[in-house]
């Protein structure tokens, strides 16, 4: 029983993220009992720093370490950690980025022989210079940047979870010089976030400074970490894109928070979660009772999408797929999948739009696919003169690619939209314009694909608010949003970025939805589909690299550090690996 409880807690810790207010509430009972959380955090950070340097075959007494220390508790964590490292012989310089430093942490650091460089002329730090000129302030900033760049390790303890929005002032200047400014890291997708081996290494204390702690956004300059040691529980930035890519390898130190009855702000999908979406076959099952998927996908222009969507749906534990489309696509589907049934009939879910041209494409309506989809989507319309009173009783429907511009103004939650960043920007612009017109409000600033990529959670939530649909926003870490939940799935290797992969996801999603008895589980089912899609890609590519790598618990045995990168794949490989992925999660 002890092992089970421990395993359950580990599962909860490593797949749940809590916003800053929740984390503070979780800390409070422990602080009231006198639990020294700051000292515990500092010990974990110092241990991690020493380990990072040891991995590079560097002894502490031969290293130069720079601490970027803010004025708050995060800076205190860093100062106590830096003091411990200095006591072990490291050459440590603390760069004070604010007007004060945590009093006890600062005293401990000075006693250990650490050096302090103050950057703010208005700082009031005992024994340190202040009141210097603007010219000297600029020189000190350049000195700080130079010292940091020449160090072996930077410990980033500037802001922690307390800041909202982008960095300002001195922290922003340091982040701009030492890190990136409002763009996601562009690095090879190595397994387990392996370090490039370049110095300085960066250890983020709790969260990288400058990222959106609660929404995973990139609002401005930030410092990408080699390793993030996070305290107590994961924060949303550790699991949400693009901030998760700035965290590097994530190490979690368990404070013992009481999280059993706390709903996470973001839940990360894993095998156990995804297994609930797979309906196990019954002895009395027929092809109809196991779930039937109807697909209006592919076109004269893109017939291959019909093959990929039907192939994926058929291999994802359904009893039958029905295909509607032009003759060329029908023939290709039957050649690839003779089990497919051509024509209309009763279904438990629909998949529409994959491989169907948008309205802006020449001859988009030439094969009648768009007309068929528009007529079907009319049954899901809410909140207008075209409202269908039975919309909530309609089967779930996956609206992909070329069908997104046919989405009605308001739909129930069993309508699932699956855009990538570019498609999401177009959809948001269309619906924001309609909302502004209806409310006689000023027009909004147009969204771009980059806007969506830099703040995908806000984009997905806004799309849900505007449409009512369950939203799956594709990415290296895919986000699924409905009224009450945010799910993240990062099971896919980077090899999945290949033509037709979204078609496979659409078919797989429709298949899982067809297996459900209750549309209330739509978001969970869709998130499970994203996870299985990534897992199938990992199987097909023989890769252990993932968009999101599960953290390691400090004090537990670490997993294999170097993993398999794998090899390129095509979308059809992913579809054929779906049965093995399903077997993996249900076993």
Q: What do the predicted segments below correspond to?
A:
Residues 1-98, 225-227, 233-416, 421, ...:
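Small-residue (G/A/S/T)-rich helix-start motifs and N-terminal tracts that mark the onset
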Residues 46-160, 164-205, 380, 384-390, ...:
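Nucleotide and nucleotide-moiety/phosphate-recognizing core
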Residues 103, 126-127, 140, 213, ...:
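Short secondary-structure boundary/hinge segments and terminal tails
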Residues 107-110, 116, 129, 133, ...:
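Compositionally biased, intrinsically disordered low-complexity regions
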Residues 121, 128-139, 209-213, 274-279, ...:
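Short gly/ser/thr-rich secondary-structure transition/capping motifs
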Residues 153, 158-265:
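Internal gly/pro-rich beta-alpha loop/helix module
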């Amino acid at each position: 029983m002890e092992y089970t409880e421990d395993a359950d807690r580990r599962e909860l810790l490593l797949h749940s993220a809590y916003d800053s207010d929740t984390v503070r509430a979780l800390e409070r009972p422990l602080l009231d009992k006198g639990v020294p959380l700051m000292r515990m955090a500092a010990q974990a950070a110092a241990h991690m720093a020493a380990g990072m340097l040891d991995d590079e075959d560097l002894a502490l007494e031969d290293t130069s370490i720079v601490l970027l220390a803010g004025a708050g508790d995060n800076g205190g964590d860093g100062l106590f950690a830096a003091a411990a490292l200095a006591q072990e012989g490291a050459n440590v310089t603390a760069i004070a980025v604010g007007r004060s430093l945590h009093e006890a942490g600062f005293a401990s650091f000075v006693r250990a022989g650490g050096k302090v460089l103050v950057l703010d002329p208005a700082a009031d730090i005992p024994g340190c210079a202040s009141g210097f000129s603007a010219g000297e302030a600029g020189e000190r900033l350049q000195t700080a940047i130079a010292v940091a760049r020449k160090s072996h390790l930077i410990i980033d303890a500037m802001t922690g979870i307390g800041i909202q929005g982008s960095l300002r002032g001195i922290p922003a200047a340091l982040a701009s010089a030492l890190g990136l400014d409002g763009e996601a890291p562009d690095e090879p997708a190595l397994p387990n976030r392996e370090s490039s081996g370049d110095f300085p290494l960066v250890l983020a204390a709790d969260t990288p400074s400058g990222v959106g702690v609660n929404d995973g956004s990139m609002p401005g300059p930030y410092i990408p970490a080699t390793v993030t040691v996070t305290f107590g529980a994961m924060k949303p930035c550790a699991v949400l894109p693009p901030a998760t890519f700035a965290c590097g390898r994530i190490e979690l130190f368990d404070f013992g928070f009481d999280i059993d009855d706390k709903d996470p702000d973001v839940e990360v999908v894993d095998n156990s979660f995804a297994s609930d979406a797979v309906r196990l076959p019954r002895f009395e099952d027929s092809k109809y009772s196991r779930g039937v998927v109807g697909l209006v996908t592919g076109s004269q222009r893109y017939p291959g999408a019909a093959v990929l969507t039907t192939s994926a749906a058929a291999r994802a534990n359904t009893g039958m797929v029905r295909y509607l489309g032009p003759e060329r696509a029908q023939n290709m589907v039957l050649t690839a999948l003779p089990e497919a049934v051509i024509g209309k009939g009763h279904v438990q879910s629909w998949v529409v739009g994959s491989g169907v041209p948008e309205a802006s494409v020449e001859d988009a309506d030439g094969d009648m696919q768009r007309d068929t989809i528009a007529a079907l989507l009319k049954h899901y319309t809410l909140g207008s003169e075209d409202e269908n009173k039975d919309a909530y009783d309609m089967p779930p429907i996956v609206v992909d690619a070329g069908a997104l511009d046919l989405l009605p103004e308001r739909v129930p939650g069993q309508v699932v939209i699956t855009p990538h960043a570019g498609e999401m920007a177009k959809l948001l612009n269309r619906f924001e314009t309609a909302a502004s017109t209806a409310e006689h409000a000023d027009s909004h600033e147009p969204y771009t694909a980059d806007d969506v990529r830099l703040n995908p959670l806000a984009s997905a939530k806004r799309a849900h608010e505007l449409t009512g649909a369950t939203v799956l926003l594709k990415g290296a870490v895919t986000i699924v949003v409905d009224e009450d939940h945010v799910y993240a799935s990062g099971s896919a290797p980077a090899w999945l970025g290949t033509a037709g992969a979204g078609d496979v996801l659409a078919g797989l999603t429709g298949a899982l939805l067809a297996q459900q008895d209750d549309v209330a589980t739509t978001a969970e089912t869709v998130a499970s589909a994203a996870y299985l899609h990534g897992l199938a890609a990992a199987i097909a590519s023989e890769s252990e690299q993932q968009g999101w790598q599960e953290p390691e618990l400090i004090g537990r045995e670490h997993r294999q550090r170097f993993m398999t990168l794998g090899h390129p794949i095509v979308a059809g490989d992913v579809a054929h690996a779906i049965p093995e992925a399903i077997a993996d999660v249900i076993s």
